[in-house]
Structures are given as structure tokens and as C-alpha cells.
Amino acid sequence: TGIKVNLINGKAGALEKRMIEEGADSSADLYITADAGRCGAFKAKGMTQGGLTSAAIKAAVPANFRTSHWAGIAKRARIVYYSPERVSGAELAGLTYESLADPKWKGRLVIRKSSNIYNKSLVASLVKNNGKAATAEWAKGVVSNMARTPKGNDRAQIMAVAAGEADIAVANTYYLALM
């Protein structure tokens, strides 16, 4: 196309700080980040312009993955990793995020801290689908089912299952491939 692209990459927080400090003088035309939660937070800080009305984007990106301020161009899922030696197929049948609060998982679950952006996005989706009260009860159930206090990144959760510290873990799909 002949369009010159100047790519600046780094940690999301550092890039966001830079663009906020630059304000209207920022040369950034496009910000690509790893999570819809970050897009919403960035919008809340007034750092998006809106007006995303491209027919091509509307045709290619389903409505639930875009707003007038941002569009999802990739999808990653928070999934449940499990130990096939300690978790039966019957236990996994019908497994949902909501069922992670079931007492049958007591002492068997690991997940990152609730302050992690991926978990914030998961909780936001549960609030949207199930309401605040149901999600608050779900969170209490998940906490009571934890095998240990949350620590480490997504890979640490997967490794905890492999090490026998837990039977199931919630982590993003791509982390296993990075291990």
C-alpha cells in the first residue's frame, strides 16, 4: 500500500503510559493489545477516538467483538487445563466457568490473582451474562476451591497441575504452546 509503518512495541502498561503522556501529540494511530479489558480501560481514560465505522471491519469482525472505539482482531480463550490422571471424563462433562465454583473442585483448582487482566475480563463476561450477584457467589466458590493462594502467571498454573499441586487450572490457550 505504500503506507509507512513505525512499529513501537513493549509492555501494555508502558505503551499506555506513553500515549497518555503524549496526549494529543501522540503519533500513534493504532494500538494493538492482548485483551479486551485493556481496550475498555484505555477507552475509559479517554484514549480512543471512536468513529470505527469501516464497512470492512463490520463485515469481518462480529458485533460482539467490536465497538465504535475498538475491534478484536484475535481471540484467545481462558480454558481449563486438567490432569487426566486425577480428573475423570465424567467430572469434565458439561464443565463451564460457572461450574468451577462447584464444591467437587474444593482444593483442586489453581488460577491467577483476580487482579490479572485476563481474569478481570473473564469476570466481566460472567457479570454481563449472569449478573453481579451470581458472579459474586461464583467468585466465592472459586476462592473456596483453590488448591493454594494464587501465585505466578498462566504457565505457573499449568505447571502446578503437572506437578500434582492441583487437578485443574484456568489459563489462556496459547501458554501451553509457549512451554
Residues covered by each model-derived region:
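Short alpha-helix C-terminal cap/hinge motif
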Residues: 1-5
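Extracytoplasmic ligand-binding site segments that recognize negatively charged/polar headgroups
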Residues: 6, 10-14, 27-165, 176
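Short, well-structured alpha-helical segments in soluble
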Residues: 17-24
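A beta-strand-loop signature enriched in Asp, Gly, Thr, and Trp
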Residues: 172-179
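Secreted/periplasmic proteins that engage bacterial cell-wall peptidoglycan
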Residues: 168
